[in-house]
Swiss-Prot record:
<dbReference type="InterPro" id="IPR004154">
    <property type="entry name" value="Anticodon-bd"/>
</dbReference>
<protein>
    <recommendedName>
        <fullName>Histidine--tRNA ligase</fullName>
        <ecNumber>6.1.1.21</ecNumber>
    </recommendedName>
</protein>
<keyword id="KW-0547">Nucleotide-binding</keyword>
<dbReference type="InterPro" id="IPR041715">
    <property type="entry name" value="HisRS-like_core"/>
</dbReference>
<dbReference type="GO" id="GO:0005737">
    <property type="term" value="C:cytoplasm"/>
</dbReference>
<dbReference type="InterPro" id="IPR006195">
    <property type="entry name" value="aa-tRNA-synth_II"/>
</dbReference>
<dbReference type="GO" id="GO:0004821">
    <property type="term" value="F:histidine-tRNA ligase activity"/>
</dbReference>
<dbReference type="InterPro" id="IPR004517">
    <property type="entry name" value="HisZ"/>
</dbReference>
<keyword id="KW-0436">Ligase</keyword>
<dbReference type="GO" id="GO:0000105">
    <property type="term" value="P:L-histidine biosynthetic process"/>
</dbReference>
<dbReference type="Pfam" id="PF13393">
    <property type="entry name" value="tRNA-synt_His"/>
</dbReference>
<dbReference type="InterPro" id="IPR015807">
    <property type="entry name" value="His-tRNA-ligase"/>
</dbReference>
<dbReference type="GO" id="GO:0005524">
    <property type="term" value="F:ATP binding"/>
</dbReference>
<dbReference type="InterPro" id="IPR036621">
    <property type="entry name" value="Anticodon-bd_dom_sf"/>
</dbReference>
<dbReference type="Pfam" id="PF03129">
    <property type="entry name" value="HGTP_anticodon"/>
</dbReference>
<keyword id="KW-0648">Protein biosynthesis</keyword>
<keyword id="KW-0067">ATP-binding</keyword>
């Protein structure tokens, strides 16, 4: 074992674990590209102030922050949304709205490492900028559901949803500053409700927030929404608009077959959310595996014009934890080509065959192991290969190859001109 190990909270990925991560990211890319989103790359190292302005209390405490050789305070990005907003402000404001962007990349947070929580991890996310419509909210949340459907997880996941605009309205009426609001939401997010309620001197506010936090239902129930409206009306709050948004979005999502859970006590740790918020939960893990929300003030905070926006980020490694097995029909086929004699002609034919395989999106590997054929068969079965191709003296003389299909336990001798058709038909 090497004396050098990955830094605590970070890890190496290879084999099946890496295959799951790549499967998630490739599936994500396919779905979002088909939905009209364009990819953006941003640096891992950014100006510290980009994140310290509005990323939220918890994230600011867990950032990797340091000074570079020019004495600038910089940070490893703890999330990617602020970077996307920076790109938009610098280079994309002139483009037609709404603007649909996506990203895939590593982020860093100095959390205490535990199952499902790493200090370096990957996020795949989208941002839709320039629309305040509830249609945009529905597009983004249903897109998230579609991604998990494509990953084979739709039947297991539930999307938890709330409208943080309800809390913002109450806090604004109570005269609570934005900075105080961020702290209160952080306390509620961490389950420290009693500490949050201590910030209020008016018992009416305490009673209403206590009621909201307790309200949750697994599907859209009109009687519970009516109960919410009646309760809110007692306190003379104008929350009808925010409640109606939550009701409309939930109703359409249910019509689309999205499994949702409305939870009025659910808030997210990012300080910039202003409207609908959501996260993906899975019964096999105790933490969310994806989440997002509406952030209509962030562009203005960074110096731009008012630009409504909504987005989400998928925790790639967290999602990988709940994928038991990559769909077999989405895994690429693998074939090993084994020259049985060491001649120029056998090697030339092997390389030509490998090129045919790769052209057809089949993984082709030249055998370099000098062991008996029986051991090779066992090895390639254990490694998950679908077939092996034998090229010996007889095959060269007859201008053919021998294919052993390992799953079907079938063997075929095929003329060279028929190789492509036989492989495609038997491996599809």
């Amino acid at each position: 074992m090497s004396e050098f190990e990955p830094i605590r909270g970070m890890k190496d990925y290879y084999g099946e674990e890496l295959n799951k991560i790549k499967f998630i990211e490739e599936t994500f890319r396919t779905v979002v590209l088909n939905s009209g989103y364009q990819e953006v790359y941003t640096p891992i190292v950014e100006d510290f102030k980009l994140f310290s302005l509005k990323s939220g209390e918890e994230i600011r405490k867990t950032m990797y922050v340091f000074k570079d050789k020019a004495d600038r305070e910089v940070a490893l990005r703890p999330e990617i949304t602020p970077s996307i907003v920076r790109v938009y402000l610098n280079s994309m404001q002139h483009l037609p709205k709404p603007l649909r962007l996506f990203y895939v990349g590593q982020v860093y947070r100095y959390d205490e490492p535990q199952f499902g929580r790493y200090r370096e991890f990957r996020q795949a996310g989208v941002e839709l900028l320039g629309s305040s419509s509830s249609f945009a909210d529905i597009e983004v949340i249903s897109l998230l559901n579609e991604i998990y459907d494509s990953l084979g997880l739709k039947d297991k996941i539930i999307i938890k949803i709330n409208n943080i605009g309800i809390y913002r309205e109450i806090f604004n009426k109570a005269g609570i500053t934005e900075e105080q609001q961020e702290h209160l939401l952080h306390l509620i997010d961490k389950g420290k409700v009693d500490d949050a309620l201590k910030e209020f001197t008016d018992n009416n506010y305490k009673d209403l927030i206590t009621y909201l936090i307790s309200l949750k239902f697994d599907k859209l129930e009109s009687d519970k929404l009516e109960s919410l409206r009646r309760e809110v009306s007692k306190y003379n709050f104008n929350l009808e608009g925010e409640i109606n948004k939550l009701s409309f979005i939930s109703e359409v999502l249910e019509d689309l077959g999205v499994k949702i859970k409305i939870d009025l006590g659910f808030v997210r740790g990012l300080a910039y959310y202003t409207g609908v918020i959501f996260e993906v939960i899975h019964p096999d893990v105790s933490f969310s595996i994806a989440g997002g929300g509406r952030y209509d003030n962030l562009v203005r905070l960074y110096g731009g014009a008012d630009t409504p926006a909504i987005g989400f980020a998928i925790g790639v490694e967290r999602t990988a934890l709940v994928i038991n097995k990559i769909k077999s029909d989405l895994q690429r086929k693998k074939i090993a080509v084994i020259p049985l004699i060491s001649t120029k002609d056998s090697l030339s034919l092997a390389i030509r065959l490998l090129n045919i395989l790769r052209k057809n999106n089949i993984i082709g590997v030249l055998n370099l192991k000098d062991v008996p054929l029986s051991k090779l068969m066992t090895y390639y079965v254990e490694e998950g290969y679908n077939a092996i191709v034998l090229i010996g003296k007889k095959e060269l003389e007859e201008n053919s190859i021998t294919i052993k299909f390992l799953e079907k336990r079938e063997q075929k001798t095929v003329k060279l001109e028929k190789i492509e058709d036989v492989l495609i038909n038997n491996l599809s």
